[in-house]
Design a protein with these regions (language model features):
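Beta-propeller domains
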Residues: 1-174
């Protein structure tokens, strides 16, 4: 889901929007090209879609008065854990129940999988000094509590790739 919306009869609309700037899903690794870590792309990764964003992602919660369009409040979460934020999901619930927790996977940042040409394409939007080129960022599974903004992060081992969550643990579930 690209964004989530929930509302009730209290004249409030809540939009929860994950955003991942500089993740270009139209780009692919080409064999032999130079990557941002200085290595060259091998045949093992040639043809792979570039899985990494060049900046941190964010999760925004906007509260809006739907009648006037007035923004009543906004919270934005952005940190090293949201690097490569992907589409989210939530645990099954009744339609009249509010979403409590959203789950997201992240790609992290793997400098050996990002061509220098992609960084050059986005050079006006990216401060390469802020990119974790030496250390990278591991992929994660995130649990975002909408009401509080609390983020629980489950770290994946280096070299793993995590896809959108399809099994979502829930309180009281078996």
């Amino acid at each position: 889901v690209h964004f989530f919306a929930q509302w009730d009869d209290s004249e409030r609309l809540e939009l929860i929007i994950p955003h991942t700037p500089t993740l270009d899903v139209s780009e692919w690794v080409r064999e032999g090209e130079v990557m941002v870590d200085g290595s060259r792309a091998t045949s093992e990764i040639a043809g792979m879609q570039i899985p990494c964003a060049l900046t941190q992602g964010s999760i925004a919660v906007h509260t809006i008065d739907p009648r006037s369009g007035q923004l009543l409040g906004a919270r934005i979460l952005r940190n090293d854990e949201t690097w490569g934020l992907a589409l989210g999901t939530h645990a099954p619930r009744a339609q009249d129940e509010r979403i409590e927790t959203l789950f997201f996977n992240t790609s992290g940042f793997a400098p050996e999988l990002v061509p220098q040409r992609v960084l050059k394409t986005y050079q006006d939007r990216v401060d390469s000094a802020l990119m974790p080129i030496k250390t990278g960022r591991p992929p994660r599974l995130l649990a975002f509590e909408i009401a509080t903004g609390a983020l629980t992060s489950y770290l994946c081992p280096r070299g793993w790739s995590v896809l959108s969550p399809t099994f979502v643990p829930r309180r009281g579930g078996t």
